[in-house]
Regions:
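Bacterial N-terminal signal peptides that target proteins for export
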Residues: 1-10
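Mature extracytoplasmic or organellar-lumen-exposed domains after removal of signal/transit peptides
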Residues: 26-397
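C-terminal motif of bacterial Sec signal peptides marking the signal peptidase cleavage site
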Residues: 17-20
């Protein structure tokens, strides 16, 4: 028994010695203990047992815009006046009483530029008609023309390809510019400048009706609640850009914005208006950053630059998406409530890229940051406005 006790004692001393050798003086030892995780707030709100959240309007407004893009603009399918009439009818009247034409740049902040923005859309319809062969004796034959420097046409190997695109004489795929106008001038404008306009949540009448639970006719929510929910609904269309993988600068953006929406809505329910304003500011700042990062990344990402270096035809869609993303930046907001960029400024960026031979000018586009009209130059200029650098938007692999 004594012998066994001696053996156990020796083993204990040996283990203690080994344990002490595995730690160095001053070393931080990671504990197995983890602080309990606080669950993310949920964007689910009810009144008398039924949901008080409704953003159906968002999809009803989006559907005709998606239809215009996919059925007519992307495929240059406005070969006859009847098709042009349908496109304009969808844009002017939409469906279910929601008219895209009336909702574009509808915020008071962009009222002064609204006419010019609508003219840009009209020009896209006109250019698409031309690319489609509208007014030509044989529209189908005219449409079957490959784009090249100074001449609009299809971009791809064959006219029958699935992923076909159509560019104007500058190499700009106008369908992608249309999307940029929609993402910025409707969705982003609705989020930041209409439904999250801080003046709404300071309005005495709206606050009083909200606190008295004065619901909108036939609905289960107050006017203030509905404004916040519609902002959240339109944000769903920006969510894929927020979730863009591999960009460290946006790594926390999704959860930050989601939490801000959920916490802001809860604060609104509890009449904590200071908290509502704090969350509103967070959404404004973070989503504006997302828009800027997206524009910069589309211009100078490895995908864009790689395709441009290999075959410019493969890069035109990405470059045009970048132009559309630049256009959308006029709808982003500073903390002060003023736009980061004006209509004229974003147009100047696009004009710089499309000057001369436009997006066909591979040498200029691939120039360094100091080269006017290069992708890096324009992206860097945008970055300065938002406090971002080209290094900030590099992917981590």
């Amino acid at each position: 028994m004594k012998k066994n006790t001696t053996i156990y004692s020796l083993l204990f001393l040996l283990l203690s010695a080994l344990s002490s050798c595995s730690q160095w003086e001053g070393e931080t030892v990671e504990s197995a203990y983890r602080e309990p995780q606080i669950p993310d707030p949920s964007y689910q709100f009810k009144r008398t047992g039924s949901s008080s959240v409704d953003y159906l309007e968002c999809s009803l407004l989006r559907d005709p815009l998606d239809y215009i893009y996919s059925s007519y603009l992307r495929t240059a399918n406005i070969m006859y006046e009847s098709a042009m009439t349908r496109v304009k009818d969808y844009f002017d009247h939409g469906e279910f009483g929601l008219k895209p034409q009336e909702e574009l740049a509808a915020s008071p902040l962009h009222k002064a530029d609204r006419k010019r923005i609508l003219n840009d859309v009209e020009e896209i319809f006109k250019v698409t008609g031309k690319l489609s062969g509208l007014g030509q004796p044989s529209p189908g034959t005219y449409r079957n023309h490959k784009a090249k420097i100074g001449e609009g046409g299809y971009v791809g190997i064959h006219i029958g390809d699935v992923n076909i695109a159509f560019a104007d004489e500058k190499g700009l795929v106008v369908a992608e510019l249309f999307n940029g106008i929609v993402w910025g001038g409707i969705y982003l404008d609705k989020i930041l400048n209409v439904h999250l306009n801080d003046s709404l949540y300071n309005d005495t009448r709206l606050r009083r009706e909200h606190e008295n639970t004065s619901l909108l006719p036939g609905r289960n929510y107050t006017e203030l609640e509905h404004h916040w929910d519609l902002a959240y609904g339109y944000y769903q269309y920006w969510l894929p850009f927020v979730q863009a993988g591999g960009l460290p600068v946006l790594r926390e953006s999704r959860i930050k914005i989601y939490n801000a929406f959920a916490r802001g809505r809860l604060a609104l329910t509890e009449y904590r208006y200071d908290e509502v304003q704090q969350q509103l500011q967070l959404i404004r700042t973070e989503l504006s950053k997302v828009a800027a990062v997206r524009a910069m990344n589309l211009l100078v990402s490895d995908i864009t630059l790689g395709n441009l270096d290999e075959d410019i035809n493969n890069a035109l869609v990405f470059l045009s998406q970048g132009c559309g993303a630049l256009y959308a930046l006029q709808f982003t907001l500073q903390e002060s409530g003023k736009p980061h960029l004006s209509y004229n400024q974003v147009k100047s960026y696009i004009n710089e890229l499309t000057a001369g031979n436009g997006l066909w000018d591979k040498k200029r586009l691939l120039g360094d940051e100091a080269t006017p009209g290069s992708l890096k130059h324009v992206a860097a200029q945008v970055g300065k406005v938002y406090g971002l650098t080209l290094n900030d938007i590099k992917r981590s692999y």
